Amino acid sequence: ARESTRLTCAAVTGPQTTLDPAQMKEWTPNSSYGGHAFGFKTFAEFLAGRESILPLIAEYSPYALVSADDPAVYMTFGGPPAIGQNQKDPTHTANFGAKLAEHCATKGVSAELHYRGLANPKHATPTDFLLAKLKAAK
């Protein structure tokens, strides 16, 4: 029998869902992390050099890679999103999850955003999400 290696779903904690410094700055003005992945020493250099790395962003950024046939994703964060506002932890802000979930919705992909303090979450933990998806896949 042959089995697929395609994911059924994914559950992640505090993901950085874009590698695009312009998106990072728009979503979270005090973003300061990520440029080192492309050889930039500072975030200002990362932002200024964005045009030169657009092909890499298109190839590797989770946000850029979303397609209609992607599996469901669950993202959990330490607090609620606040798009366009400085964050205590800009590297792991729920702004990343909110914007990816919004983008996934435009492609028809299920994306569940969870954060500490969320009232009545569909799944309270990544494990709950994974179990529900894996049991449904049988």
Each model region followed by its residue ranges:
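C-terminal catalytic histidine-bearing segment of alpha/beta-hydrolase fold enzymes
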Residues: V73-K88, A94-K138
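Hydrophobic beta-strand segments of well-ordered beta-sheets in folded domains
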Residues: A10, P71-Y74
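Primarily recognizes the serine-hydrolase "nucleophile elbow" in alpha/beta-hydrolase
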Residues: A1-T28
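Short amphipathic alpha-helices and their capping/turn segments at secondary-structure boundaries
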Residues: R2-L7, A58-A68
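Noncatalytic linker/hinge segments flanking ATPase motor cores
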Residues: Q16-L19, G49-E59, E112-P121
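Mobile cap/lid helix-loop segments that gate and shape the active-site cleft of serine hydrolases
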Residues: P21-L65, H92
